[in-house]
Swiss-Prot record:
One of its GO terms (molecular function) is structural constituent of ribosome. This is Large ribosomal subunit protein bL35. NCBIfam families: rpmI_bact. It comes from Photorhabdus laumondii subsp. laumondii (strain DSM 15139 / CIP 105565 / TT01) (Photorhabdus luminescens subsp. laumondii). The keyword Ribosomal protein applies. InterPro entries: Ribosomal_bL35 (IPR001706), Ribosomal_bL35-like (IPR021137), Ribosomal_bL35_CS (IPR018265), Ribosomal_bL35_sf (IPR037229). One of its GO terms (cellular component) is cytosolic large ribosomal subunit. GO terms for biological process: translation.
C-alpha cells in the first residue's frame, strides 16, 4: 500500500497540540494594516484553534500529524 501524501500547505499552517487539537494563525494581519485599529490587530495576534467542524478536513490533510 502506498504512503499517503501530506498536503504541504496545511503542514505549514497547522501545528498539532498535545491534546489532539490543531493551532492556527488568525487571518487579516498580513497587509493593509493602517486602516485596522490597534485593538483589532492586537486581538488577531494570538493563535487560534481549529474549530470542531473543520477538524476533520485538517486531519485528512495531515495524515501523519
Amino acid at each position: 500500500m502506498p504512503k499517503i501524501k501530506t498536503v504541504r500547505g496545511a503542514a505549514k499552517r497547522f501545528k498539532k497540540t498535545a491534546s489532539g487539537g490543531f493551532k492556527r494563525k488568525r487571518a487579516n494581519l498580513r497587509h493593509i494594516l493602517t486602516k485596522k485599529s490597534t485593538k483589532r490587530k492586537r486581538h488577531l495576534r494570538p493563535k487560534g484553534m481549529v474549530s470542531k467542524g473543520d477538524l476533520g478536513l485538517v486531519v485528512a490533510c495531515l495524515p501523519y500529524a
